[in-house]
Each structure stands twice: as C-alpha cells, then as structure tokens.
Amino acid sequence: MIKEEFLRKWGKIKVFSLPWHTSHQYELLKLPFEWHYLIQHVRKWGHQARPMPKHLKWVAYYEPGKYDFALLHIDQQCLSPKIAYGKTMLFREVRGQIKDIPIIVINHGTPVYPEVFPQKAEEDGMEPTEENGIKWARQKMKEALEGVAEMVVNSYEAVEMWGWGHPIIHGLDKEEWWDLPKEPRVVTFISPAGIGDKYYGRRLFHDTRTILKEKYGIELVWIGTDKYCKDWDDYRDFLGRSLVYFNPTFGSPMPRTRTEAMFSGCCVVTTKHQGADRFIKNGINGWICKDNPEHSAKLIANMIFDYKKAVQIGQKGRETAIKVFNGERFREDWLTLVDKVLEKWKKK
C-alpha cells in the first residue's frame, strides 16, 4: 500500500513504541505515523548509530485510548529473564499494559542459541540437543506473543525457523549511503561479546581473521572494536571507503550491516545463511563463502589483491541492494501490514 492511499484511508495514526534497535527504527520512523516512544531505563536511542528524528515524541507512560496500535520488539534473548533480564521484563511489563489496541511485535532474532536453549529444553524435560533447544524457543515465543496481531521477522528463513511470522525484509534509502573511492581494506561489524557465538558466526570470524593475517598479511578491521565510529557520518565514511565487507553470521536474520555495505559499494563476502543466496550471485555481485575459514579468507584475499574486480563486484552489489532492499518497498510493506491489522481490529 502506498503512502497516499494509506493516509486517505486512515489519516495520521498514532503509534506507541519504545527504543530497541536504533538503526532499524530510524527506517521505521520514516512511516507517516505520529510516533510516541516510552521513556525507560533499559533501552535508549543510540545517537551514535543514527540521529534521532525530530518528529519523534516521548512519553512517560502508556495512556489507554490515545493510540491506534503498538509496535513492540522482542528477540530470542527475551525468552527467559536468566538470559537477558532487562529486555525480557521490559517487554513483558509494557505488553501487559496494552489491552485496548492491536499489538505488532518485531522479532529481531532466530532460535539459533545452542549455548543456552538446549539447557533450557532439558529443564523442561527434553533431551539437551540443539534441535530440542529450537523447539523450546519456538514454544516459549508462542507463549510470549499469544494474542498479538502479528509477529514480524526480518527474513523468510526466520519464518521457517520460528514456525510462523510475517516477513518484512529491511530497506534503506540509497541517498543516505556513501559509495566513496575504495581503500584496500576488509571490514566486518558483528556483536563483539556475550552469548551468540554461532548466531553471529564469531568462530568463523576469528579463524578467518587469523588466517588472513598469518597467511596473507591482511588485517581484518572489526568495526566497533578495532575502529570506533564517533557518529553515523564517521561510520558511513569508513564503510564507504572500505573495499571488502565480510559477513560471517549463521543465525542473524538478514544482517543490516551487510546491506549497508552493499549500499556503500563494498564487495561483500558472506555466508549463505538466512537467505543470502537468494540475492548474492557468486563472483557477480558478491561472494558466498563456505563455513570454512580457509575458504572465506581466500575469497577475501583474492578481492584485496584484485582491486579492480572487487570494485566491479561492489558496484553490482550496490545495484542489487537498491533493487532488493529498497526503502520505498520496505515502507509500502509496512503500510500494507498495518492496514491489514487495523482493518481486522476494527471488525472485532
């Protein structure tokens, strides 16, 4: 549904929400809604990641009768207070207060958490296997989201892994990403610590990094750890000047930073998981690496040593990003979903 059609039908609706993933919400806040975010002490707007839009309003509590729908956030860490107490309790408490409007929940994760979920499954009487851990997570997510209007996920594979969900693939606006002259550098940007080694592909990352340095003399720059970006401009400048971007993730659904790298004209080397092979064509607009650090390191090294080819692939990747991860399409997908939810609620 396009913006003009939605506004003619519903006018400027009011949405209740709260901070979660700043970069994702920066795009959501481009939707033609009146946004109200809850002030609390668990999640705050990340000014380093994105500037806060001026039209965003802040409220101290939820006021029944004031809003048209609520947009809340969850991920696999929220399935138990023992995993992430703050996020878990924030979701439960806020969700429990909202009874007069439909709730849409964005599930930002997948049930890939073998460090924790098999043990949780064992506590519930199952064998402590990774498969049972996924089953446990599916059930707990269904319990947590019972009664919500829709659960939105970030990849088609996430729908399969959770067993349900409405996929909306993220979208960006090409004008906001800087495709600059490239320096012969490889970078990555994944979570540096905490639970989630398989989810983020940290072992593949670290092993690839070691091989690159020892075998090829190449430094893999870890954004957020090796390179601190003071603000979004600094990040876009550094990413836009990087020749190669490496994405090692396994469970992360459609990693946003990989898409940002594609918009920035980087030559992307990525694992195939969560649908990357739907849009990356080997040697044309990027590279799909095996879950093998020797293979990923070789692909990266080949691109660092073949600057011209890497730039050409990066340009094809940018064309793909503009087509597949289009911001206008992202917003239209959201307007279509919100229209459906509001229509269904109106008929109750």
Task: Pin down the residues of each PLM region.
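Conserved catalytic-core segment of nucleotide-activated headgroup transferases in glycan assembly
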Residues: 37, 164, 171-232
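A charged, aromatic-enriched C-terminal amphipathic alpha-helix characteristic of glycosyltransferases
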Residues: 291, 305-345
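Aromatic "clamp/platform" in nucleotide-sugar-dependent glycosyltransferases that forms part
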Residues: 249-250
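Membrane-proximal helix-turn-helix segments that form the acceptor-binding/catalytic region
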Residues: 60, 64, 88-94, 111-150, ...
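Conserved acidic donor-binding segment of nucleotide-sugar-dependent glycosyltransferases
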Residues: 280-283, 287-293, 302-307
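Short hydrophobic beta-strand element within catalytic cores of glycosyltransferases
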Residues: 267-270
